[in-house]
Structure formats: structure tokens, C-alpha cells
Amino acid sequence: MQPETQESLSTRFAAQQEIQLTLIEKESYDLKDHLAYWKAVRLENVIAYYARKEHITKLGLQPLPTLAVTEYKAKEAINIQLLIQSLLKSEFALERWTLAETSAETINSSPRNCFKKVPFIVNVWFDNDERNSFPYTCWDFIYYQDDQNKWHKTEGLVDHNGCYYVDLNGDFVYFTLFQPDAVKYGKTGLWTVRFKNKTISASVTSSSRNTNPSSESRVGLSTSSSSESPRRRPSISENSNTESPTSSTSRLRERRRREPRESGTTDTTPRRRGTKRKLGSDSAPTPSEVGSRSTTLARHGYSRLGRLQEEARDPPLVLFTGQQNNLKCWRNRCTTKYASLFLCFSSVWKWLGPNSDGGAAKVLVAFKSDAQRQVFLNTVHIPKGTTITLGRLDSL
């Protein structure tokens, strides 16, 4: 085998570039052609990497990038090759695919390592101000792999929290969240989402509880069409109820009578996806809670009273109780897909001793704030038969 020279490397290097140009000019819609293109990209960068290792800085008239750049591009091409080869074995191989839809820019954009088609822009107005806005990209069609590397096709969706898709298990997989940028670039912690002639905004209303004379602020979502007049724009409150307060109250009382009492108290919290939630205190902190918080709040987005109450609390957490195998699989899924929605996860554990609850498995999840905890509970699918207990700890 003859050693490679600069001339032989230049010839092979130019041949791979010629293959790429031919495939680009072909404007094919066949995945096999796109696979050949990325094979040529991989070989081009492998040759460039080898030349750089041999202290060759040019092949022909073209200067070569650094070793780190050629290594990265070669690995990137290998990854895309593997993804296309896998997609070729799926039912979506016969669909119309452009070279741009298999490009590195598309595959590396969120959601990463997924194929996407038909992008659309989602404009987010921080502080509900058009002058303080940022465009995000979502997709009409998203192709993703499950745990068995099988491809599935779904639609890209948008809500007030961010851009997401719903996977085969019914879980909401968020690949873009607006809240971190709202805290970073906004002052009020509020934002408006506009896309496809639709508008989703947070409207602040006030309500009071019979057991507490002080009013509390609640944020609800409203959606509308951007083509309507702002003054006459009808708002549709999320989870709204068109029944009268009297009928809602009577139904709540009936539900309270049907549910069992535990330790002299009644759990009136609505059930979500077959789970029972035991609520901790979400009102003002007690004197013993003051000064024990170990995390720092965002600079904006709280009223003066709300900031004082939140800073006085400990970091919030949720205790999940259920079957051991279900909790283990669920924990692995959460740490993979929803790492941005919590602070830390515990391992699966059990209480011991004669007073334990029959060996039920438990998982603790800690959060940076009450808002993050609420987003987690609203987003993540909880395993069936799992109970939820909200609480706080002095330290983690």
C-alpha cells in the first residue's frame, strides 16, 4: 500500500467535493441521494483531518480548517448518516425529502436529532411589548425516535409555556421554553405568544378564598385571533367553566361529601390523570419558615408581597408514591426529556419499619421555585396510580 501524498489527498478531496456539488444540483427528493451526500461530506472531512495530522495545510488551492473543526464535521456527518439510514428503514422513507430537511442546521436545531418539516415562526413579546420580542422556530411536522429507535411522526405545537410535541406515551416533550428568556430579557415575567394569526397571552385576575381575607393573584391564559380588534377581542380562559358559581359550588360540595376524610381533614384538590394530590401550604410562610430558603429568586416577575413570601420559603419539592418499576422508568424518562423543568431527582426509595406504608416506592423531586414546580406538574405525565404530596425541606 503506497503512502498518501499531498497530490493524492488533493485528488480524493476534490472528488468528494464534486460528488457533493452534483447531488446539490440534482435537487433530489430521495433519501438515498441525501445519504450519499453525507457520505461524501464525511469522507471529505476524514481526508482533511488526515492531511492536517500530516501537517498539510492546503489541498489544492483550498486551505484546510483546524483539526478540531474537521473532527467535529466528520462526527456530525457520521451522526446524520446513521439517522438517515435508520429513517430509510421506516415507513417515512418514501416521503418527499429535500436536502435542506436533512441538513445539519435542521437536525441540530431543537428538537435535536429529529427530522423536521415546514417551519413556522413563533414571536414572543416579553413584557407583552412588541419592541421587546424574539422569534422562535417551531415545525408543522416532527419525526422522532422512541426508546426502541422506531420513528414516529407528530405535529409541532405551541402553548404559553413553549414549543413542544406529544410523544407516543402522551407526554408533552418541550424543546423550547419561553420562561427563562422572559426572566432574562423581561421585567414583569409576563409574555405574549403570537403565531399563525393566533395570540396567547397571560391575563392577571384576582380572586379570594373564604378562609383567607387577603386576595391572591392568579395568572390565566387567553387566546385570540390577531386579525380581531384588540378592544373587542374575546378571551378564552384556559380551564374556564361557563357554569354559574352556584352550580360549581354545589358540585364541589358533592365531591367533598363523596371523598373519604383523612385525619379529620378533607382533600378537595381536583384529581389529575388518575392521581391523588396532597397539597401543602401555599399561603404566607409561618415564622419557622422564614429565612430558610437556599435558592435565589428571579429579579423580576413578583409583586412586593409575593417576593417577600417566596424568599421566606424553603425550596419546593414533590413526593411521588407508587409502584417501584413505574417510578424508575418514569424517573429515567423525566431526566432525559424534562431536565430543565426541575432542580434534582432522588433515587427510588422506601420507608422502613413497622409504621411504613406497606413498602410503597417513593421519589422526591426538588424545584427552584413554585412556578417551576407547577410547570412540571402541568407538563409531565404522572404514572397511573401514583400519589402526589407537595412539601418543602430545610435543605437539600
From Swiss-Prot:
Chain intervals for the UniProt region annotation (DNA-binding domain): 314-396
Region Disordered, residue ranges: 202-298
Protein name: Regulatory protein E2
A matching Pfam family: PPV_E2_C
Superkingdom of origin: Viruses
Region described as Transactivation domain: 1-207
Amino acid composition bias (Polar residues), ranges on this chain: 283-297
GO biological process: DNA replication; DNA-templated transcription; regulation of DNA replication; viral DNA genome replication
Gene3D superfamilies for the chain: 3.30.70.330, E2 (early) protein, N terminal domain, subdomain 1 (1.10.287.30), Papillomavirus E2 early protein domain (2.170.200.10)
Listed Low complexity bias regions: 203-228, 236-250
Subcellular location: Host nucleus
HAMAP family: PPV_E2 (MF_04001)
Function of the protein: Plays a role in the initiation of viral DNA replication. A dimer of E2 interacts with a dimer of E1 in order to improve specificity of E1 DNA binding activity. Once the complex recognizes and binds DNA at specific sites, the E2 dimer is removed from DNA. E2 also regulates viral transcription through binding to the E2RE response element (5'-ACCNNNNNNGGT-3') present in multiple copies in the regulatory regions of the viral genome. Activates or represses transcription depending on E2RE's position with regards to proximal promoter elements including the TATA-box.
Primary localization: host cell
Mod. after translation: Phosphorylated.
UniProt keyword list: Activator, DNA replication, DNA-binding, Early protein, Host nucleus, Phosphoprotein, Repressor, Transcription, Transcription regulation
GO molecular function: DNA binding; DNA-binding transcription factor activity; nucleotide binding
The family this protein is said to belong to: Belongs to the papillomaviridae E2 protein family.
GO cellular component: host cell nucleus
Subunit structure: Binds DNA as homodimer. Interacts with protein E1; this interaction greatly increases E1 DNA-binding activity. Interacts with protein L1; this interaction enhances E2-dependent replication and transcription activation. Interacts with protein L2; this interaction inhibits E2 transcriptional activity but not DNA replication function E2. Interacts with protein E7; this interaction inhibits E7 oncogenic activity. Interacts with host TAF1; this interaction modulates E2-dependent transcriptional regulation. Interacts with host BRD4; this interaction mediates E2 transcriptional activation function.
